[in-house]
Amino acid sequence: MVVVSLETGARVEGKWRPSSDTDTHAALYNAFPTLGGIVHTHSRWATAFAQAGRGIPAMGTTQADYFYGEIPCTRPMTPAEIGGSYERETGNVIIGTFRERRIDPAQVPGALVHSHGPFAWGTGPLDAVHNAVVLEEAAFMDWHALALEPRKGPMQQELLNKHYLRKHGPGAYYGQG
């Protein structure tokens, strides 16, 4: 583990070099102040959706328990973004996607970067890892559901509301927390 300054990216504590994705993380932390941990993976199924340029639709209750809707995929990055401050711009395309689509990052704790892979976040590092695992499982299940029924759309809104809000809404009653 290495502690870095969100303003400068400089190492504050620890013996390791900061991740090459530090600027992506800093952009997300600065734009979304409720984030307490971020995880970036290249997990197989979620990355397949990212490479296809597709979000992960909310097709089932496993996803609905943690993500209040589709896990979005960003637009492709421009040549200028790729050739410039690539890592910072990676964060910016995620931020832009959430702002343009009016998605609350606390309600949808993850995104796919087009042609790249998933980023997930949470209230802390363990929550971010957990959300990354759920994101990958949702991608796995959706891929298989779409293989079985290519015309399958998202789950009905009422079921999404029930599963998400019983854990995260006012008067939440599901679980031990």
List each language-model region with its residue ranges.
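Glycine-rich flexible loops
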Residues: 1-177
